[in-house]
């Protein structure tokens, strides 16, 4: 779409979202738009430090988990000794950015609000890792903790997956992978999905929205996809285009959160409408005035905190 035809998003977002957009970090260098992926990853980690400050303190442990691809870092957040369930968190970042530090506050708040153990999985980023490596690493970590639950003193009888953006796709894809391959890692009580992409190649919101403010232009989305997938055929895989999977049966209860001015919003709407049409347990909530990635900004945005509380409440209601 011709850029002039897109919605004037920055004029339409909420007051608290505008405050976030206008928040300057004077010690931060400019975004290395023409830099290497390594430079962009470093910048992303630095930029997120401010937004991760002030998170709840709790017992935190780090473990390296073996997979067929090598060791994968995990981080456990334990808000109480006797957790009712374990939530696996997959960070966003377009498959190419992000780590356990960039999403630390999100995971801590989710653990605090749910009172469940949260395990962040630092899956290998793309393009170093190609589809389906990240999913297989997540599944391997889930199996590992299920087998070692007593040693790590965690409750793996009931589990869940949660993620934002690309992490939301990985969360649902991992749950479907376990279902389809009949892998027992405990009962999947729920899946929490914040503004994910699930397989649409075009949509109204992808046309009307997306720009330099969110890194989600059509060109950006194509770049993330090309970095993540191994070949063109992967675009139709039921673990990438999740609408090609069977969404009519045995889908764990899904909390689907949408951001009003997110180009990926139609992915969330379609996922909800598909699941609801086939009587699969699901809930959709739209957060007005928000941009993609708003979950990071709970230091300033009540809406971000609300979205995390909503997800935690949905999950605990399934237990």
Curated annotation (Swiss-Prot):
Q: What is its main location?
A: cytoplasm
InterPro entries annotated for this entry?
AB_hydrolase_3, AB_hydrolase_fold, Acetyl_esterase, GDXG_lipolytic_enzyme, Lipase_GDXG_HIS_AS, Lipase_GDXG_put_SER_AS
Enzyme Commission numbers on file = 3.1.1.-
What PROSITE patterns does the database record attribute to this sequence? LIPASE_GDXG_HIS, LIPASE_GDXG_SER
The record's subunit annotation is: Homodimer. Interacts with MalT and MelA.
Disulphide-bridged cysteine pairs: none
Function of this protein? Displays esterase activity towards short chain fatty esters (acyl chain length of up to 8 carbons). Able to hydrolyze triacetylglycerol (triacetin) and tributyrylglycerol (tributyrin), but not trioleylglycerol (triolein) or cholesterol oleate. Negatively regulates MalT activity by antagonizing maltotriose binding. Inhibits MelA galactosidase activity.
Q: Which HAMAP family match?
A: Acetyl_esterase
Q: In which domain of life is the source organism classified? A: Bacteria
Q: Which Gene3D superfamilies match?
A: alpha/beta hydrolase
Q: What is this protein called?
A: Acetyl esterase
Which Pfam family would be a valid example here? Abhydrolase_3
Does Transport show up as a keyword for this record? no
**PANTHER family assigned:** AB HYDROLASE SUPERFAMILY PROTEIN C4A8.06C, ALPHA_BETA HYDROLASE FOLD-3 DOMAIN-CONTAINING PROTEIN-RELATED
Give a Gene Ontology cellular component term annotated to this protein. cytoplasm
Query: Where found, per UniProt?
Result: Cytoplasm
Q: Which residues form the active site?
A: 165, 262, 292
Q: Which UniProt keywords apply?
A: Cytoplasm, Hydrolase, Serine esterase
């Amino acid at each position: 779409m011709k850029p002039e035809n897109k919605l004037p998003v920055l004029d339409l977002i909420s007051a608290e979202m505008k405050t976030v957009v206008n928040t300057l970090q004077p010690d931060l260098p400019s975004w290395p738009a023409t830099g290497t992926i390594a430079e962009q990853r470093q910048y992303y980690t630095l930029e997120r430090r401010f937004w991760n400050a002030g998170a709840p303190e709790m017992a935190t442990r780090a473990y390296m988990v073996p997979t067929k691809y090598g060791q994968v870092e995990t981080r456990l957040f334990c808000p109480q000794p006797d957790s009712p369930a374990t939530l696996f968190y997959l960070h966003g970042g377009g498959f190419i950015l992000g780590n356990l530090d960039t999403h630390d506050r999100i995971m801590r708040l989710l653990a605090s609000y749910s009172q469940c153990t949260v395990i962040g999985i630092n899956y290998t980023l793309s393009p170093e890792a190609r589809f389906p490596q990240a999913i297989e690493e997540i599944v391997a970590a889930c199996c590992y903790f299920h087998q070692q639950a007593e040693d790590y003193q965690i409750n793996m009888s009931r589990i869940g997956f949660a993620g934002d953006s690309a992490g939301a796709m990985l969360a649902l894809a991992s749950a479907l992978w376990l279902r389809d391959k009949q892998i027992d890692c405990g009962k999947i009580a729920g899946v929490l999905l914040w503004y994910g992409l699930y397989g649409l190649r075009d949509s109204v919101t992808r046309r009307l929205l997306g720009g330099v403010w969110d890194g989600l232009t059509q060109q950006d989305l194509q770049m993330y996809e090309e970095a993540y997938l191994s070949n063109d055929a992967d675009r139709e895989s039921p673990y990438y285009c999740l609408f090609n999977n069977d969404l009519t049966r045995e889908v764990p209860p899904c909390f689907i959160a949408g951001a009003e001015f997110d180009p990926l919003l139609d992915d969330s709407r379609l996922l909800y409408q598909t699941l609801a049409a086939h009587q699969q347990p699901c809930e959709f909530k739209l957060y007005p005035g928000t941009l993609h990635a708003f979950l990071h900004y709970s230091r300033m945005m009540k809406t971000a905190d609300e979205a995390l509380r909503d997800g935690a409440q949905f999950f605990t209601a399934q237990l």
